[in-house]
Amino acid sequence: INVECAFRCAKAERLQTMTTQNFHAQWAWRGAESAVANVRIGVSNGLITSVEDGVEAQAGDERIAGVVMPGFVNAHSHAFHRALRGRTHGGAGDFWSWRTPMYEIANRLTPETYGELAAMTFAEMALSGITGVGEFHYIHHQQDGTRYVNPNEMGLAMVAASQRAGIRMALLDVAYLHAALD
């Protein structure tokens, strides 16, 4: 599967000065049982404005070999958990022991480090064909527990990270008030 289209379409979306760009896909999956051949996709100001099946490429179309398909959506992400990779799988741990390193990482994040970590996470998603993410957002305070002057400081870092990676994000604001089941 050619995920290049997701990047090219995202590129066209970011280039708001570009009024119209047309792509011609050798094959496109349109939700049916099989892919459709020779699909022309028109993009205007970052939005798909037309899709034509079974047509030949026209002069100026950007040709895409292989199969294109709509971008995937990751509807459940905790971007900062990327920092846990390789740190929680040793021994016979369980969910409760896993929380300790998770809290340690969460308590060390600043808007800058959170943004960098999220940008790397979102870039990996984009490289996998994900074009939208639902990010569970529950880190709102400074390392010492005090509020930021701007209460959305950490959220703004997440928004900037998703824009930097070129994927859309729904910031799912979560109130994490209790860390136990009882």
Q: Which positions does each model-derived feature cover?
A:
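A cross-domain feature marking catalytic cores of carbohydrate-active enzymes
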Residues: 77, 171-173
